[in-house]
Amino acid sequence: MGASGSKKHSKHSQRLRERLLRAHGGGYVQQCNASGGEYSQSQEGSGKGQKSPSCEGQQYRQGDFMNTPWRTPAIEGQKKLYKQQNMDDIDSSDDDLVGVPVTPRVPLRAMTYKLAVDMSHFIKKRGLDGMFYSRDRHRILDLYLEKEEGIIPDWQNYTHGPGVRYPMCFGWLWKLVPVDVSQEAEDDETNYLTHPAQTSRHDDEHGETLLWRFDPTLAYDYKAFILHPEEFGHKSGLPEKEWKAKLKARGIPYS
């Protein structure tokens, strides 16, 4: 019975990977080498004295999500098909969600530290590391964890840029890292206008292209709160005047 449950869970998680890869740029994706910063093409795939807030109860901030995946055709013969796929993607973004349950399979629950750590390792096995970030992929990940695991989608928020964006949910071990798209990719005529990799930097107020990076140290090092406590507002433990002044200085809106 345990083996059967494991196979079922694996099947659902594989569907997640497939949906993430299909989101604006399936087939092939360029992933950044963690050690040298190089790209390889693969088939898709201090706050002392302050009380650190958990990831529970944070508001879902649609519109904070930035940047998109990258893909280059493997061979010259694929370029026509690739260009057509880019056009098809414009009209078929909802197709990426086919197969997601309409209602959660389990009772809804808030994200907790332990759950965030467990889900982080689970998602890592599905190949999220090095995948380019996009609004669609953000939405797919939220929807998957809501429908399959019952996790209320109010937790996946990251600090503002520029630079590395750290998770505001303590226990979520994924950060968003800015990368430079290669000049060769820039010059590829199939990428002009239609592909999100060319337009993603215009979506980001800082003009950066981001990818997901797994960072196990985030399990005990609450970088978001340590580096940017002002982004937690009233939960930061800072005087209201101080955290508002810091947000204003960084050009971050607040209410």
Curated annotation (Swiss-Prot):
Reading the lineage from the top rank, the first entry is Viruses
Check the record and name the Pfam families matching this protein.
F-protein
Coiled-coil intervals, chain numbering: none
Xref: InterPro entries: HIV-1_Nef_core_sf (IPR027481), HIV_Nef (IPR001558)
Annotated spans, Mediates dimerization = 139-155
State the span of motif (PxxP): 104-107
**Record region (Disordered):** 1-70
In its UniProt record, a GO molecular function of this protein is:
GTP binding
Region entry Acidic: which residue ranges?
88-96
Q: Name one GO cellular component term.
A: membrane
Where is it predominantly found?
host cell
Q: Where is the composition biased (Basic residues)?
A: 1-14
Q: Where is the composition biased (Low complexity)?
A: 35-52
Q: How is this protein positioned relative to the membrane?
A: Lipid-anchor
Q: Which UniProt keywords apply?
A: AIDS, Host cell membrane, Host membrane, Host-virus interaction, Lipoprotein, Membrane, Myristate, Viral immunoevasion, Virulence
Q: Where is the lipid attached (N-myristoyl glycine)?
A: G2
Give the location in the cell. Host cell membrane
Annotated family: Belongs to the lentivirus primate group Nef protein family.
Which purpose does this protein serve, as stated in its record?
A: Factor of infectivity and pathogenicity, required for optimal virus replication. Alters numerous pathways of T-lymphocyte function and down-regulates immunity surface molecules in order to evade host defense and increase viral infectivity. Alters the functionality of other immunity cells, like dendritic cells, monocytes/macrophages and NK cells. One of the earliest and most abundantly expressed viral proteins.
Subunit composition and interactions: Homodimer. Interacts with host CD247/TCRZ; this interaction induces down-regulation of cell surface TCR/CD3 complexes.
Q: What is known of its domains?
A: The N-terminal domain is composed of the N-myristoyl glycine and of a cluster of positively charged amino acids. It is required for inner plasma membrane targeting of Nef and virion incorporation, and thereby for infectivity.
Q: What is this protein called?
A: Protein Nef
